[in-house]
């Protein structure tokens, strides 16, 4: 190996002396207007060589002096931020000791602590090719029962005669088992070593934790993970030779084009819609995105084609840098691919830690053709489809060669993403607790929803395990199977609470989930007591709210309307739009209080957002609330604050514990903020309520109160509407008509404002079946009447 790389180094030094290749790179801010991205792409400027700032309207790019001349000749306003990138990248590591940085990181708290054998490399903190391969050899020496020795993918070698290596991690790595396969690659582009370094970190981590982490053990035992850390071997060695301290800016491979130029962009050379247009790739040899003379003309793409066609990869992560993005097909067209919903749902979960913006490559950055993701997913005749992603690792300051102190944090922030890729290749599913925060009766049920996410079918067993002595009994486990990808099954397990449970008591149990390989356990905390509805609005009007939101009649959760930020179309750019509850809600006697509502949204992820806020001082200050569906904001939003963005097309029930505001008067506000970039349909909410447990009221099993009159529904059966007549001889507020299913699950509460009258009930959103209706006031309730929904 040493002799081979000595020869290769000599060849690269000779190539480096070709005048046309002495390229100077700079970091430039390019001001953008409508249509400018297309103009840049047509000029051969790489549109994946930097970060877009939609809010301020510029593209921060790392480009050659030749490309900078093109940009200026097109009339763009520019600002040079760094004149000599290679020197700048190397200089900012001066005085930094990689070993000291590693030791400091090992002492820091992290969900993914630094593996003992992981090392930073000698090339600006990144491993050289020899160092990378030495790590693969070291892993095989340490864990021969879990990882293969490095192997050549193919007899085909690179332009300079180098093999492309892979390793496989599994419980029987040298045996071809019938297990889901996942692919990880790094360095399609020679100046993007963070992908390689992350894969080394990830491999060391899962190997070192195999015997101590049961979930990781089961993942490795039931998955075949394939790693190709360096695809563009020649290009990377060229950068190591020209800039041994890091900062080399060569992107392409080292193909001699015969006209004084070198290199083909490997990630424009795959065969699916190769050369579709001259914006997504370039026909000109000197351009950074030169696609070559034909699809798969390059040995690197030929090798990867062979690798994919001789395996059955379910998911692939092709690591790149930089822009804090997670991209997926299509790249060549803005039309969504057939599995767009699956890609989006996976992405939402994979970016939960790093908060990368996700979306189709064509619409999230700019159309590209001949890319790895489009071919891996789109080619389905010579192989099965692969759900292929491109993580673009690093922010605008990290660039292509992050400072050595940033390498480990970048490796760590992508760990969840890489782990989920393996899990999603298998029978992975998610279990969601849907039991109301307030349990109203001692004989009740734990409600849950199971969603199959993984590419492999599985059988799932759900059970509840009581904590403490509050439970008299629990029901049998529930078994669910034969779900399709993204299909959700709703079910429940009955339980009974003991006589020792009193009003406002906390109830705790474990919701256990066995997917056939390992068991996950989540502790669930609820409260026992009679729910008192102190606010309910299903938006027949907007009388309870002020601001610029309005009613929307299409697809409400319950007719006739839902509340929307922009009921007449997409929200506008640079919007700050709120709707605020006019009257305060009193939580004076509450021990527990819950805000709940149904919501759906379509909001540009990573930039625009909605927050739900609460105020306990009549609106002087507002605090954002954390719910089941919020996540921390990115650097382009409100960093770390809970918010909603992305796409949730179906109504979901949000439930937020606001018990910390018990004893106070509160107001609620919804706020949408947008930047100057992409706009979307916005945020919708419906059936908003505030429910509490009243500490002044003892909890009893509700008794029938003979003086409450409730009529039979009319019509019955009902389709969209039915009417109930009622008469309360003793009306004292906090009274409503409850709608429950036959299991006793509370579906809806309709507040009653008068002692008697007729009330029209919208039934259009109820599923067909039988329901029980009754009047509830505190611990008392009327007889139940049956309603049949057609």
Label each PLM-derived region with a short phrase.
Residues 472-501:
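Intrinsically disordered, low-complexity Pro/Gly/Ser/Thr-rich segments with frequent PxxP/GP/PP motifs
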Residues 27-30, 163, 240-241, 245-443, ...:
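Metallocarboxypeptidase
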Residues 607-609, 674-693:
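Extracellular carbohydrate recognition
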Residues 534-578, 623-652:
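Extracellular glycan-recognition surfaces and repeat-rich motifs
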Residues 496-531:
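Terminal connector regions
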Residues 4-7, 15-20, 703-714, 718-790:
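C-terminal outer-membrane/trafficking sorting elements
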Residues 428-440, 532-542, 573, 691-714, ...:
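Residue-level detector of functionally pivotal "anchor" positions at catalytic/ligand-binding pockets or at interdomain
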Residues 539, 587-601, 610, 665-674:
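Extracellular beta-strand-rich recognition modules
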């Amino acid at each position: 190996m040493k002799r081979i790389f000595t020869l290769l180094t000599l060849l690269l030094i000779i190539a480096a002396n070709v005048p046309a290749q002495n390229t100077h790179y700079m970091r430039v801010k390019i001001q953008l207007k409508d249509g400018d991205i297309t103009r840049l792409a047509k000029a051969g400027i790489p549109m994946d060589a930097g970060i877009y700032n939609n809010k301020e309207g510029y593209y921060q790019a790392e480009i050659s002096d030749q490309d900078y001349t093109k940009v200026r000749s097109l009339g763009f306003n520019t600002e040079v931020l760094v004149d000599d990138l290679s020197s700048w990248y190397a200089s900012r590591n001066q005085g930094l000791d990689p070993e000291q940085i590693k030791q400091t990181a090992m002492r820091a708290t992290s969900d993914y602590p630094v593996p003992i054998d992981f090392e930073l490399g000698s090339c600006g903190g990144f491993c050289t090719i020899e160092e990378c391969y030495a790590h693969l050899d070291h892993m095989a020496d340490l864990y021969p029962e879990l990882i293969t020795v490095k192997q050549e993918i193919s007899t085909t070698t690179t332009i300079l005669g180098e093999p492309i290596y892979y390793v496989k991690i599994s419980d029987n790595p040298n045996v071809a088992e019938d297990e889901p396969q996942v692919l990880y690659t790094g360095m399609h582009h020679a100046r993007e070593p963070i992908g390689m370094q992350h894969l080394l970190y990830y491999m060391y981590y899962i190997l070192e934790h195999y015997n101590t982490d049961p979930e990781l053990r089961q993942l490795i035992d039931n998955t075949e993970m394939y790693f190709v850390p360096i695809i563009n071997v020649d290009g990377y060695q060229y950068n190591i030779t020209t800039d041994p301290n890091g900062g080399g800016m060569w992107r392409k491979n080292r193909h001699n084009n015969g006209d004084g130029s070198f290199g083909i962009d490997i990630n424009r050379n795959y065969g699916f819609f190769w050369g579709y247009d001259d914006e997504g790739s370039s026909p000109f040899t000197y351009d950074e995105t030169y696609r070559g003379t034909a699809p798969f003309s390059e040995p690197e793409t030929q090798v990867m084609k062979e690798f994919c066609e001789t395996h059955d990869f379910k998911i692939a992560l092709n690591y790149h840098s930089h822009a804090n993005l997670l991209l997926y097909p299509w790249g060549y067209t803005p039309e969504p691919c057939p599995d767009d919903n699956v890609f989006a749902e996976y992405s939402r979960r994979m970016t939960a830690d790093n908060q990368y913006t996700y979306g189709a490559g064509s619409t999230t950055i700019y159309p590209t053709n001949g890319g790895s993701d489009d071919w891996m997913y789109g080619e389905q005749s010579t192989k099965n489809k692969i759900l292929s992603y491109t993580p673009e690792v690093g922010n605008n300051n990290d660039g292509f060669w992050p400072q050595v102190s940033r390498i480990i944090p970048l490796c760590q922030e992508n760990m969840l993403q890489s782990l989920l890729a393996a899990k999603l290749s298998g029978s992975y599913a998610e279990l969601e607790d849907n039991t109301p925060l307030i349990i109203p009766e001692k004989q009740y049920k734990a409600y849950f929803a199971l969603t199959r996410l993984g590419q492999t079918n599985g059988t799932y067993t759900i059970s509840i395990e009581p904590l403490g002595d509050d439970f008299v009994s629990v029901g049998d486990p529930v078994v669910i199977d034969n779900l399709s990808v993204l299909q959700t099954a709703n079910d429940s397990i009955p339980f009974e609470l003991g006589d020792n449970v009193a009003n406002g008591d906390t109830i705790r149990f474990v919701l256990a989930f066995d997917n056939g390989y390992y068991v996950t356990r989540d502790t669930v905390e609820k409260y026992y007591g009679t729910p008192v509805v102190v606010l309910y609005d299903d938006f027949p009007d907007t009388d309870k709210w002020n601001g610029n939101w309005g009613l929307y009649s299409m697809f409400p959760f319950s007719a006739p309307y839902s509340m929307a930020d922009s009921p007449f179309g997409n929200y506008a750019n640079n919007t700050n739009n709120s709707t605020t509850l006019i009257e305060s809600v009193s939580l004076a006697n509450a021990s527990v209080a819950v805000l709940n509502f149904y919501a759906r949204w379509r909001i540009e992820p990573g930039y625009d957002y909605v927050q739900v806020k609460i105020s306990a001082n009549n609106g002087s200050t507002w605090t954002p609330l954390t719910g089941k569906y919020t996540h921390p904001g990115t650097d382009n939003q409100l960093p770390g604050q809970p918010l909603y963005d992305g796409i949730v097309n179906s109504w979901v029930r949000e439930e937020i514990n606001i018990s910390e505001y018990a004893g106070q008067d509160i107001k609620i506000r919804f706020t949408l903020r947008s930047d100057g970039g992409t706009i979307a349909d916005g945020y919708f909410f419906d059936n908003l309520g505030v429910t509490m447990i009243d500490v002044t009221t003892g909890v009893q099993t509700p008794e029938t109160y003979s003086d409450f009159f409730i009529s039979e529904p009319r019509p019955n059966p009902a389709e969209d509407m039915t009417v109930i007549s009622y008469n309360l001889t003793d009306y004292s507020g906090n009274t409503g008509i409850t709608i429950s299913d036959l299991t006793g699950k509370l579906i809806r509460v309709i507040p009653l404002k008068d002692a008697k009258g007729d009330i029209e009930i919208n039934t259009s959103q109820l599923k067909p079946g039988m329901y029980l209706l009754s009047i509830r006031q505190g611990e008392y309730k009327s007889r139940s009447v049956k309603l049949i929904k057609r």
